[in-house]
């Protein structure tokens, strides 16, 4: 008799932090102001175009998204970064994606009562 694998459930990982369109736009518009100030001479010469502000309404209309779950909200909303700040890990440590997968798998297994 041969053994076979069966998928009996699925898991989901949802980050604890969320960013609303309003929060994202506030941060993005601050970045736009920083960019335009930093590049004001090139913008005045016509070498590059000035960035323009966005709005929460535009994001919702264009994407249908009102809020998104994120890892490291502070890093994403920092107009000097605009990306998550996730420390580099050694090759001996599990990756962020591995941790996410393990949490999702654990949630799935608990639902089907393999783990308690």
Where are these regions (language model features)?
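Conserved "HGTGT" condensation-loop signature of ketosynthase/thiolase-family condensing enzymes
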Residues: 1-116
């Amino acid at each position: 008799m041969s053994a076979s694998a069966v998928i009996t459930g699925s898991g989901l990982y949802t980050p604890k932090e969320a960013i609303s369109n309003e929060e994202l736009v506030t941060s993005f518009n601050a970045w736009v102001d920083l960019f335009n100030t930093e590049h004001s001479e090139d913008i005045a010469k016509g070498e590059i175009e000035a960035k323009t502000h966005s709005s929460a309404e535009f994001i919702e209309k264009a994407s249908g998204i009102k809020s998104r779950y994120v890892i490291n909200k502070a890093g994403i909303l920092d107009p000097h970064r605009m990306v998550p700040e996730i420390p580099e890990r050694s090759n001996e440590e599990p990756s962020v994606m591995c941790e996410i997968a393990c949490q999702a798998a654990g949630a799935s297994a608990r639902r089907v009562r393999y783990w308690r």
